[in-house]
Design a protein with these regions (language model features):
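C-terminal motif of bacterial Sec signal peptides marking the signal peptidase cleavage site
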Residues: 20-23
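Bacterial N-terminal signal peptides that target proteins for export
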Residues: 1-9
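Active-site His/acidic residue clusters
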Residues: 273-281, 326-330, 337-374
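Bacterial signal peptide processing site
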Residues: 25-27
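Loop/turn elements at helix/coil->beta-strand transitions in domains of secreted/extracellular proteins
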Residues: 43-44, 74-75, 85-88, 164-169, ...
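N-terminal catalytic scaffold of extracellular/periplasmic and nuclease hydrolases
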Residues: 155-311, 394-467
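Solvent-exposed alpha-helical segments and adjacent loops
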Residues: 29-158
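Metal-dependent active-site segment of extracytoplasmic phospho-/sulfohydrolases and closely related
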Residues: 13, 178, 368-402
Length: 467
């Protein structure tokens, strides 16, 4: 018995020693395969971000740090640009460093710039686009083990990396017509949660088209408009997830479940609002709130759909709560290796346009921008992501008057077309088109792998070439 115990102890010691040696060997191998950037070992660099800038820059710096740790078990330091300049720096965003002044590239949309100078590297991109720069930098220069990487000493302009999509994000600005998206050209209100932007972020997207929004009732309401975007069918006003014959029709959230993907429904409106309901229930009257609530609970149980709604906030501290909701939901749905479908609605553009309150409408477009930025950060760090922004309808007939001042001309929905902004592989299908709103969901479904989604008897998925 003692002999057996002794042999067992010897075996444990041998295995433990082998494990330690293997671990050391791996760490040594990883340290020797670390790349150099313009002749300087990666371990000599410090990451620097703009202390006075937007949070996107700090998050991009933290992303680079985390990827270096993951790839090489090397923990680079992060400092802000108020601290002493180091010998070799990776500069993230427009800092006070001299290299940032040298870079100062003219970029448009989702373009970003990279420059190397005197042993340091600088990355710049407008607002959240710095995330695309950080991802590109890591994938292009840091994943090549034992490589001698050279970065140009003149500024180079790049586009985000995209891959075949498995994640699909649909962002809906309720009531957001053309001039709601152009509101920054006419107004300049002080909003404490803005990025200081002077444009709707959709205009940074590479592909822009438009859609027609009429329902079978004529001018659409949000129920029929939401159903068109969710299910690919024209239906009557007040109908949620059902066709003209009151038959249930499959939504993109249900399609995601069938394809093994996760699904999420988000809105600043309560969950029983018309748009989130269009993506989660099949009911003949949008006003049946108790029935909608029960049906949504059943959808969560049956399909695993994450329904996260109801946050109408108007201050900087509270807006961050919306960002937290977005990040949390993205973390949950992206845990599925098959990908996800997620719909997010900014509901209050519509509500304030009904009230003809242009200042509040402006604030809601800014608030929508904040959410869009968070979704786009995710898309840049996860390039297998397709993002589309649109509206279910326009509200208020917002137009410039003869003096060039924006004015409401109505207090209800209008027949006006709405814009489509698209990003990711497949987004080019929407460039310059004027289509029926149902074709948006037809095309998203096709990109997900289902060519025959919705009612395509007249208007088909753009993947089939019918515009």
């Amino acid at each position: 018995m003692k002999t057996k115990i002794s042999l067992l102890l010897i075996l444990i010691i041998v295995l433990s020693t082998f494990s330690i040696l293997t671990s050391c060997s791996k760490k040594e191998a990883q340290s020797t395969t670390m790349p150099t950037i313009n002749g300087v070992s990666l371990k000599e660099y410090t990451i620097v971000y703009d202390a006075q800038g937007l949070d996107y820059n700090k998050r991009a710096a933290e992303y680079i740090k985390s990827k270096v740790l993951e790839l090489y078990q090397l923990e680079l330091s992060i400092i802000d640009d108020d601290e002493t300049t180091q010998a070799h720096e990776i500069i993230v965003g427009e800092t006070s460093r001299a290299i940032s002044e040298s870079l100062n590239a003219e970029t448009e949309g989702f373009e970003f710039a990279i420059l190397s100078d005197n042993g340091s590297v600088a990355l710049e991109g407008d607002y959240f686009v710095i995330a695309a720069a950080a991802y590109y930098f890591v994938e292009t220069y840091l994943t090549i083990a034992d490589a001698a990487v050279t970065i140009e000493e003149t500024a180079t302009i790049h586009q985000p990396i995209t891959k075949e999509a498995k994640n699909f994000i649909l962002l809906i600005g309720d009531g957001m017509g053309v001039y709601q998206t152009r509101i920054f050209e006419y107004m300049d209100y002080d909003v404490d949660y803005s990025d200081g932007e002077k444009l709707f972020y959709g205009y940074m997207f590479p592909y822009i088209g438009s859609s027609r929004t009429e329902s079978l009732s004529g001018i659409t309401d949000s129920a029929a408009g939401g159903t068109a975007l969710a299910c690919g069918y024209k239906t009557y006003n007040k109908y949620l997830g059902i066709d003209e014959n009151m038959s249930p029709i499959k939504s993109l959230t249900e399609l995601a479940y069938e394809l093994g993907k996760s699904a999420g429904v988000m809105s600043t409106e309560v969950s029983t609002g018309a748009t989130p309901s269009s993506f989660s229930v099949h009911i003949e009257d949008r006003d049946q709130s108790s029935d909608i609530s029960q049906a949504q609970t059943e959808a969560e149980l049956k399909y695993g759909t994450i329904i996260d709604c109801g946050y109408d906030y108007y201050t900087a501290s509270r807006i961050h709560l919306i960002e937290n909701h977005v990040v949390s939901t993205l973390e949950k749905v992206s845990a599925n290796e098959n990908g996800f479908f997620l719909m997010y609605e900014e509901a209050y553009i519509d509500k304030h346009c009904h009230n003809n309150d242009i200042k509040r409408a402006y604030e809601m477009v800014v608030r929508f921008n904040q959410a869009i930025a968070r979704f786009m950060e995710f898309a840049f760090y996860n390039p297998e992501t397709f993002v589309l922004i649109t509206a279910d309808h326009e509200t208020g007939r917002l137009l410039p008057d003869e003096n060039g001042k924006l004015q409401f001309n109505f207090d209800d929905h209008s027949e006006a077309d709405v814009l489509i902004f698209a990003y990711g592989q497949g987004a080019e299908l929407f460039d310059g088109v004027n289509i029926e709103n149902i074709q948006i969901s037809h095309t998203i479904a096709a990109l997900m792998g289902e060519e025959n989604f919705g009612d395509q008897s007249v208007y088909q998925s753009l993947t089939k070439g019918n515009k």
